[in-house]
């Protein structure tokens, strides 16, 4: 790897592009180490994501009764699985020293799937939180109206909305040649970027810069902040209701879905933080992005393989590891049997005596 491969920096780029390259603040050796680590991490994520989410999809579609909960988790698994299927192109991109050989269409599709996965997952988790909240606050109404058909309808709306919010990737993602390599990047100005998208002394395009800000802030608000606030409000309401109903001692209530939600926001928080910082690139040292952006992206991508792992290790007491893997998945994904009976003291007595596998998916 020659030194000239690292002669680009964030100061060289107009505000309307978002290249994925190794920056000059990294030495050739450091850049090679980062690239190897990314290839290794992405490969592990891809393998775990395809196998884990694929297993969840098979288990739900072939082995389990269709319930509202299984509909939620089936859609989560499908969204993660689709992204992981296309993750090898990102692995190859890093392995080829950031030389994109898959064409402009795949450049658009691969980034679209990453953003679509983010929106689909966060919207599903938000709806699940709202569903749990309604089940606690209005158990009778929930028992009468909470149906598989309604869950499928909600999922359809979520997928369509996620497609709409992810569509900027299909418009602005582009490829261009730089230093003898083809890069996959965001061309928010929609300028002809075939020859040189990053001139030595670029003129900031106000239109492209404005689009960049709108897309970044929209993703942060719709894909992180607003869902996070709604989810937090739902679970604060649930905790308050359970405490007033003397159910605070219920055995680890909502532990799996709550852990999945917390994991999602922890994984995506660095990603949004760095892309918001990128809007103020001039006031942030370029070295901050050199390792921060690749690391934040890797952490965000890792979320796509986390859910099956959480299902397995939290479906039952982890100490009982002798329990078969398939049993753990079924127990974790099964419909909770007592969601509509929270206010009842009799249900509390019953729930307290239930096996962990019966309450694990609350």
Swiss-Prot record:
Any Pfam family the entry gives: 7tm_1
Cytoplasmic side: 59-70, 130-151, 241-255, 303-362
Gene designation per UniProt: CMLKR1
Top-level taxonomic group: Eukaryota
Tissue: Widely expressed in several tissues including adipose, muscle, liver and brain.
Residue positions, PTM Phosphoserine: 334, 344, 347, 353
Gene Ontology MF terms: adipokinetic hormone binding; adipokinetic hormone receptor activity; complement receptor activity; G protein-coupled receptor activity
Similarity comment: Belongs to the chemokine-like receptor (CMKLR) family.
Disulfide bond sites: 107-184
Extracellular side, ranges: 1-37, 92-108, 173-219, 277-281
UniProt membrane topology term: Multi-pass membrane protein
Keyword DNA damage carried by entry: no
GO terms, biological process: chemotaxis; complement receptor mediated signaling pathway; G protein-coupled receptor signaling pathway; inflammatory response; negative regulation of interleukin-12 production; negative regulation of NF-kappaB transcription factor activity; phospholipase C-activating G protein-coupled receptor signaling pathway; positive regulation of cold-induced thermogenesis
Assigned GO CC terms: plasma membrane
Xref: InterPro entries: CML1, Formyl_rcpt-rel, GPCR_Rhodpsn, GPCR_Rhodpsn_7TM
Chief site of localization: membrane
Subcellular location: Cell membrane
Keywords: Cell membrane, Disulfide bond, G-protein coupled receptor, Glycoprotein, Membrane, Phosphoprotein, Receptor, Transducer, Transmembrane, Transmembrane helix
Protein name: Chemerin-like receptor 1
Gene3D superfamilies registered for this protein in UniProt: Rhodopsin 7-helix transmembrane proteins (1.20.1070.10)
Phosphothreonine modified-residue sites: 337
Polar residues bias locations: 339-354
Region Disordered, residue ranges: 336-362
Residues carrying sugar: 7, 187
Task of the protein: Receptor for the chemoattractant adipokine chemerin/RARRES2 and for the omega-3 fatty acid derived molecule resolvin E1. Interaction with RARRES2 initiates activation of G proteins G(i)/G(o) and beta-arrestin pathways inducing cellular responses via second messenger pathways such as intracellular calcium mobilization, phosphorylation of MAP kinases MAPK1/MAPK3 (ERK1/2), TYRO3, MAPK14/P38MAPK and PI3K leading to multifunctional effects, like, reduction of immune responses, enhancing of adipogenesis and angionesis.
Membrane-spanning ranges: 38-58, 71-91, 109-129, 152-172, 220-240, 256-276, 282-302
